[in-house]
Amino acid sequence: MAHKKGVGSTRNGRDSESKRLGCKKYGGENVKAGNIIYRQRGTQIHPGTNVGCGKDYTLFALIDGVVKFERLGRDRKKVSVYPAS
């Protein structure tokens, strides 16, 4: 019998920190200018009306209003912010 534990168990046990990507504000929610709406890697969702896109593809509101997710053609999505009436 071996008197030392197998080396395999000590080589495991690493994992990367989660990046907290995804939707931060949902359709119909009120947002203020500058609020982050969606964090993503690449353009899963494209910026629509009154929505800006950061260098890491983060979508954010340019005006105060209400979030609306829409289709952009057949196979794309976009998010827009419309003024609350």
Curated annotation (Swiss-Prot):
Ranges that cross the membrane: none
UniProt entry keywords in alphabetical sequence: Ribonucleoprotein, Ribosomal protein
MF terms in GO: structural constituent of ribosome
Pfam family, one: Ribosomal_L27
Any one GO CC term of the record: cytosolic large ribosomal subunit
Xref: Gene3D superfamilies: 2.40.50.100
GO biological process: translation
InterPro entries to which the protein is assigned, alphabetical: Ribosomal_bL27 (IPR001684), Ribosomal_bL27_CS (IPR018261)
Region (Disordered): 1-22
HAMAP family, alphabetized: Ribosomal_bL27
Family affiliation: Belongs to the bacterial ribosomal protein bL27 family.
Identification of the protein by name: Large ribosomal subunit protein bL27
Species of origin: Geobacter metallireducens (strain ATCC 53774 / DSM 7210 / GS-15)
